[in-house]
């Protein structure tokens, strides 16, 4: 009787874990849907087609993705924290706005290079060019291709957060990447970012490590600036 009771408890626990796993999977799917926008074009021949997806890497999306990976790989808290730190560092989230773009091109060959003149992010009626992007996006292709594109998070002159008080942002791709199937119309994706708060990601050990990295970068920049000023002063004195 006792063995049977224990078996029932174990089965109940297992079913609970499975239920939680599926619930989390559904939650990630819902989060992904919220932050992924798509556009699909069908050619006049009704056969050729182009689908473009763009995923805005919001705090909600990143947190849900990390949680999904942690559960799928059965990571410890330390392993999850390490992955989060590396993931955030790779995304350059403290400096830039990352957007993942996916193409599934079953139409004309696409020519997208140089990609930094093909894309722009509009924030408060001002357009910003990519500051970095996956260079594979420069090459012509048919079929599937994807890559991350990074836009500035702070004003270059004032250092102000460009997303402060902003409700929406719009990613626009020029029609030149696929002029025939888009009929010369730009491709646009709009996100509501009013409730996005990347600072939520920087908590606990992750926050401490990121802050240390930031300070080290700052010190390195100060050293570089000092060296440049000393070189200028020396040039003046030697003149």
Where would I find each of the regions flagged by the language model?
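Bacterial N-terminal signal peptides
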Residues: 9-18
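Conserved functional micro-motifs across diverse proteins
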Residues: 24-239
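Bacterial N-terminal signal peptides that target proteins for export
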Residues: 1-10
């Amino acid at each position: 009787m006792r063995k049977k009771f224990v078996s029932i408890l174990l089965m109940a626990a297992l079913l609970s874990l499975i239920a939680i796993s599926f619930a989390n999977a559904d939650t990630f799917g819902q989060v992904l849907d919220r932050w992924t926008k798509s556009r699909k074009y069908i050619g006049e021949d009704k056969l050729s087609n182009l689908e473009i997806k763009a995923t805005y890497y919001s705090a909600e999306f990143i947190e849900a993705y990390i949680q999904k990976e942690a559960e799928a790989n059965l990571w410890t808290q330390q392993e999850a924290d390490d992955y989060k730190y590396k993931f955030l560092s790779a995304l350059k989230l403290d400096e830039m706005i990352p957007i993942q773009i996916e193409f599934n091109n079953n139409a004309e060959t696409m020519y997208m290079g140089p990609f930094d003149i093909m894309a722009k992010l509009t924030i408060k009626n001002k357009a910003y060019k990519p500051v970095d992007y996956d260079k594979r996006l420069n090459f012509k292709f048919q079929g599937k291709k994807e890559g991350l594109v990074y836009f500035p998070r702070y004003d270059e002159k004032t250092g102000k957060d460009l997303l402060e008080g902003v409700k929406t942002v719009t990613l626009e791709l020029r029609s030149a990447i696929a002029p025939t199937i888009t009929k010369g119309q730009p491709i646009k994706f709009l996100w509501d970012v009013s409730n996005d708060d990347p600072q939520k990601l920087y908590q606990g050990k992750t926050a401490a490590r990121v802050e240390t990295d930031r300070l080290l970068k700052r010190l390195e920049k100060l050293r570089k600036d000092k060296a440049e000023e000393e070189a200028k002063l020396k040039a003046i004195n030697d003149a």
